[in-house]
Amino acid sequence: MRKWFRSFYSSGLFIPFILLLPYMCTIALNGADKALLLHSPGVEDMVPLMLMVQMKGDYAEEAVKAQAVIARSEVYRRLEEGESEGEILDEVSESIAGKNRERRVEQMTAATEDEEVLSFRIAELNSGRSFVVRYGGVWKLLSAVDKLQQYGAAAEVTAGQVLTYNGKLKLVPYHEISSGKTRDGTEVFHSAEYGYLKSVESSQDREAPGYVNSAYVPASQLPAKLVVKKRDSAGYVTALTADGNWLEGETFRQGMHLASADFSVQKVGKMVRFLCKGKGHGLGFSQYGGNEMAKKGSSWEEILETYFPEMEVEVVMEMGR
């Protein structure tokens, strides 16, 4: 028994077990619903989970911190617009469940009473974080120690900090790789309301793996004549015609599942090739560009100042807490 205990203790499982013991006792005595209600989620609890959805691959610490501020800003903005924490967690949980394979998330599920209320508890562990999510009437114990440890630390260091424009929470977009220059909000949305999203240079993105992507589509499946009509100052297509019918560039990009709206069109035999630069919509924070800045010594504050020069970092208190 002593030998088993020493092995259990040295394995690193002892501390997580002790930390979860009160929670397990609460479930045994009062039921799982009571336990989860006693540990309802807060904005800071959501941030590491949102990072699991928003970030792909490995990123430097300062880049993750920058994304943490963006994620937190998104939560507070959505809460301010009337969404509930449960609705946001519902969406995040569903996204995590859909991406658990690529993110190497281990899941253990067990059926429970079907309720519409989504409850949540997150517990800090010595080797990272694990969390219990109730989604669609099922309890899920998820753990992705390597990532959640990094994401949890980024959330803690930047706790309470959000991006604002003139003291107000605004849309703070991000994308994986720009075409070498991020887009201007006014040009994309055709509204001065988004003028705080300025186009900035992100030339390091041109060196990113996957910067250039080709998509081939049978010509028979496309309109006979596709013509790019307008591009914005960053090179992204804003308008094109399909057999004379006008289409919006980003809408076309999403409908065709193209990597980016900075594309050219070329006929190749019986196929049409779309040659795309960058990945994503190109607005706001370039994750690749920010990561390259972080690797060269830039802080998360400097990264955000670069990609959001019109915005400021402010500290907020958790709403309703």
Predicted features along the sequence, with ranges:
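Conserved, single-site charged/polar hotspot
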Residues: 1-321
